[in-house]
A protein has these predicted regions:
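Acidic, glycine/proline-rich Ca2+-coordinating loop motifs
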Residues: 1-156
């Protein structure tokens, strides 16, 4: 079993990169997050691995808090109208492509403001496809992403 550590906190982006510890099967682990594309440097609070596209491998969602905590709601939403700002602090979705994780957050429909504190992966609507629920804090509404069964989600 491998271990993935979501490293939030008030540190610089370099110091809060998430950690992927790969089991070497001799009571040791090696850190390989960068190699696998999972060295997310946002303020991560939780992570889940699941097969969102039913291709037989595990994909990944890293739930993040916003870098813009403490701003009033109007300023916060103005800041997040800039896609670069938004992409740094949104929760991130990674597709497993041949053992390397690729950030496809915008492609799957999850590029939205996030202050995630709770994450649930389940078939919410009983259609056999896994959906995503993110419980956000402060003035960011919770998000219920229902699978469109085509590799994208709709926030309902």
């Amino acid at each position: 079993m491998d271990i993935y550590v979501s490293q939030g906190g008030p540190y610089s982006r370099e110091l809060r990169k998430n950690i992927l510890l790969i089991n070497q099967k001799n009571n040791t682990f090696k850190e390989k997050a960068t190699l696998y594309g999972l060295d997310d440097d946002s303020i991560s609070t939780q992570t889940a691995f699941f097969d969102y596209d039913k291709d037989g491998d595990l994909d990944c969602i890293v739930m993040n808090e916003s870098d813009f905590y403490g701003y009033d709601p109007l300023t916060f939403y103005k800041i997040n109208q800039n896609k670069d700002n938004l992409s740094k602090s949104a929760s991130h979705f990674y597709e497993n492509k041949n053992g390397k994780f690729i950030n496809i957050t915008e492609k799957v429909g999850l590029l939205n403001p996030s202050f995630g504190l709770g994450l649930c992966i389940a078939d919410i609507n009983n259609d056999t496809w896994l959906d995503i629920y993110i419980a956000n804090d402060y003035y960011i509404p919770d998000a219920m992403y229902i699978s469109n069964k085509d590799g994208t989600f709709t926030n309902t």
